[in-house]
Amino acid sequence: MRPIIFILCLLPFGFAASGCNGNPLGPATLPNVLDTVVLGALVGTEIGTPSAFAVASGSAVRSDQTSQFDFAYNLESGGRHVFLPQAALGISNSSGLAPGLLLSDESFSGITEAPLNGYSTLDTVTIAVNQVIVARSSLVCTSIGVPVYAKLRILSFDDADRQVTFEVLANRNCGFRDLVPGLPDN
């Protein structure tokens, strides 16, 4: 019985030591990398065209094959370009935290850390060229109950092909919010 008590007494020291690097989960293992993504509109494109984005994988996905995405793109009648968070599409989220989008007045390079709050989860978000957006995933790190984050900047629209092109930097490390290239510290 005494060895168990001894081990239990050492646990707080182990947690304290692991927290010395700035994140109690230990160092990040996945580097933040800048990428360029093209999405086709939900309506009016070929069925095989990816029209949604999953922050956790940092990739475009087909919304007809999975609901494991955070937002989708559409070109509405009248020419308005929009991103739609999952809930705006009527997709319920069982993780307890709905994916969201946050329009930013900061430059793409000026965003170095994802905010914790302020994300639009239910509303359609109108987008424009050079618009900067921070995206929050659903709870993909279920063992610790946190989302992952990304920042993106709209580069261009192709109305004829009903596409949007954007650059994205996703931090796919659980518990980290840094949005700068390389291995994040936080």
Could you tell me what each predicted segment is?
Residues F15-G19:
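C-terminal motif of bacterial Sec signal peptides marking the signal peptidase cleavage site
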Residues M1-L8:
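Bacterial N-terminal signal peptides that target proteins for export
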Residues C20-N186:
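Surface-exposed, beta-sheet-biased, low-hydrophobicity segments with strongly acidic/polar composition
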